Amino acid sequence: MKTFVEIVDVYARQILDSRGNPTVEVEVELEDGTVGRAAVPSGASTGIFEAVELRDNDKSRYMGKSVEKAVENVNEIIAEELVGLNVFDQVALDKIMIELDGTDNKGKLGANAMLGVSLACARAAAEYLGISLYQYIGGVNAKVLPVPMMNIMNGGSHADNNVDLQEFMIMPAGAKSFSHALRMCAEIYHTLKNILKDKGLSTGVGDEGGFAPNLESNEEAIQVIIEAVEKAGYKPGEEVFIALDPASSEFFNTETNKYELKGEGRELTPAEMVEYYAKLVEKYPIISIEDGMAEEDWDGWKLMTEKLGGKIQLVGDDLFVTNTKRLSMGIERKVANSILIKLNQIGTLTETLNTIEMAERAGYTAVVSHRSGETEDTTIADLVVAVNAGQIKTGAPARTERVAKYNQLLRIEEELNAMGEYRGLKAFYNIRK
């Protein structure tokens, strides 16, 4: 087998994401004509510590959201450095781009430019070898199929309603396999739609395919989901669990140091906010809370971890932004017990893999995630299996840009056959009871 395969072309273009906003797509061509292609996602609620997504800010084009500059950076700066190099040397390719950029936050070339190239290189290498992307990234040990963390109800900045918490999700940890888990989720999703219809509530879907009905409170959203789980014939707390993503940085007032639950007309101190979650956890089968406290409220995070870290999964998204520096601060301070992994928060495959490795060494789980602005690219489905992460967050079983990831996981499950493993509740090795 050849160990050096030359990159002969790196080319980027502007395409549209699932919200109709421009994003970057990159193609990497190899000496034998093999092409690897990758498209980059984009978030709505973004952490302030995320790597920079370069946009043109020219109001006369796509409301200022075009990415021509990022595309130009690939075609004129990055391509020049990578053409002639070995596609199999992922670490070196990513390192060259990081050095070319030279900033802490990918502000010069843009994380969207760099990630497109990084992923297209990996895909080209896998294509050349004639193997699946998860096998190329993860090797022979890549075999764990993830428990879906499926967003079926929205509030916060993903919706226009009275619900403050951003995402209400189901996790079919009691399923026998990934395909069984997906079926359970789809059945619950359709049942939920019918329940909302019967109540005369909206069944329009948000950016990630979840419903955004105008409910009275956060608790009502949980109750309606539990009703859907039971009506679909499943047992809450045994087969299906609830996960929340409050995205609390969005409703944290840094001046008053309070969490403003506007839908409920309440302002809570960090300690009261932790108490609020503790009561929900006691009352409902909640297994995971993501970004329960704001990205800069380290004291609040500490309180929440001390109170709930032994009972449920506490995921840092805005807190950690897929960044080893931020994650090591969290590990040191004993804050959270899980990290959300979003490729575009950091900007290269190598750095993403380093973050996942650091999390797992510290006993934290890694939940591989989509963004609210997605494309038909299915890299995250391969990534979650490649690193045996055991959990994926990629939206409702609706909207093709979400379903594409689930369908890719069905193919991977089929390919792995008896080798594949669906861990269910064992995926939560971070909950130290």
UniProtKB/Swiss-Prot annotation:
Gene Ontology CC entries for this record: cell surface; extracellular region; phosphopyruvate hydratase complex
EC number: 4.2.1.11
Compartment(s) where it occurs, according to its Swiss-Prot or TrEMBL record: Cytoplasm; Secreted; Cell surface
GO molecular function, one term: magnesium ion binding
PROSITE patterns assigned: ENOLASE (PS00164)
Record bears the keyword Zinc: no
Xref: InterPro entries: Enolase, Enolase-like_C_sf, Enolase-like_N, Enolase_C, Enolase_CS, Enolase_N
EC category name: lyase
Annotated metabolic or biological route of this protein: Carbohydrate degradation; glycolysis; pyruvate from D-glyceraldehyde 3-phosphate: step 4/5
Residues annotated as catalytic: E208 (proton donor), K342 (proton acceptor)
Co-factor: note: Binds a second Mg(2+) ion via substrate during catalysis.
Main location: cytoplasm
Obligatory cofactor(s): Mg(2+)
Binding-site residues for (2R)-2-phosphoglycerate, renumbered to this chain: Q166, K342, R371, S372, K393
Similarity-based family: Belongs to the enolase family.
Its biological purpose: Catalyzes the reversible conversion of 2-phosphoglycerate (2-PG) into phosphoenolpyruvate (PEP). It is essential for the degradation of carbohydrates via glycolysis.
Protein name: Enolase
Organism annotation: Clostridium novyi (strain NT)
